[in-house]
C-alpha cells in the first residue's frame, strides 16, 4: 500500500485521513480514562502519521505505528517498522512482528504490569495483543478468533462500554 502513496504529499494524505469517521464518543471516553489515571495510546499497524493525527485529535499519550517515509513532505513509498513490533527474548508469541511486543514495551516504559493493561482491537493483527493484555476487548470485529479470545466484546460503535471495565 505504501508504494501506492508514493508521490503524494502529507497534506493530501491528511485530508483523506480527516474524512475517515471516528467513533463518536472517542474523545469523551479517552478524557474519562485519563481522569481515572489511565495512560491512553494508539498502537497501529497503519502509518504513524495517521495514528499521530488521531492521537492529537483524541489527546492520547502515545502512538506506535509503522513509519511511512517522507522526503520534503512527499511520501517515498517506503515504510519502516518500529523495532517495538519485533520479536525479542521477552516475546510471548512466535510472530516476528507483533503488537503484543509493543504491549511489552509499553508495560516496561510506563511500569505497568501487562495484567493492568486494557487493549482494544478489531482485526486478526490484534489477537496476540488482546490475548496478553489484562483485559482484551474486541471492538466491532468480524474476526471470530479475536472475538473468541477477547475477555470482552463490544458490538456497537461506542467506546463507552470500556468505562465499565476500566475501574
Show the residue positions of the predicted features.
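N-terminal helical cap/lid subdomain that shapes the substrate entry/recognition surface
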Residues: 1-12
Amino acid at each position: 500500500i505504501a508504494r501506492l502513496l508514493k508521490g503524494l504529499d502529507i497534506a493530501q494524505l491528511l485530508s483523506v485521513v480527516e474524512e475517515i469517521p471516528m467513533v463518536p464518543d472517542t474523545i469523551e471516553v479517552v478524557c474519562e480514562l485519563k481522569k481515572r489515571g489511565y495512560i491512553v495510546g494508539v498502537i497501529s499497524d497503519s502509518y504513524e502519521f495517521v495514528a499521530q493525527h488521531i492521537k492529537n485529535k483524541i489527546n492520547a499519550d502515545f502512538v506506535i505505528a509503522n513509519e511511512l517515509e517522507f522526503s520534503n513532505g512527499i511520501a517515498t513509498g517506503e515504510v519502516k517498522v518500529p523495532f517495538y513490533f519485533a520479536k525479542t527474548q521477552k516475546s510471548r508469541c512466535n510472530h516476528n512482528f507483533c503488537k503484543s511486543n509493543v504491549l511489552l514495551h509499553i508495560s516496561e516504559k510506563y511500569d505497568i504490569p501487562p495484567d493492568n493493561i486494557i487493549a482494544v482491537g478489531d482485526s486478526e493483527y490484534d489477537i496476540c495483543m488482546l490475548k496478553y493484555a489484562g483485559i482484551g476487548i474486541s471492538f466491532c470485529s468480524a474476526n471470530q478468533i479475536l472475538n473468541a479470545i477477547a475477555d470482552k466484546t463490544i458490538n456497537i460503535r461506542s467506546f463507552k462500554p470500556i468505562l465499565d471495565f476500566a475501574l
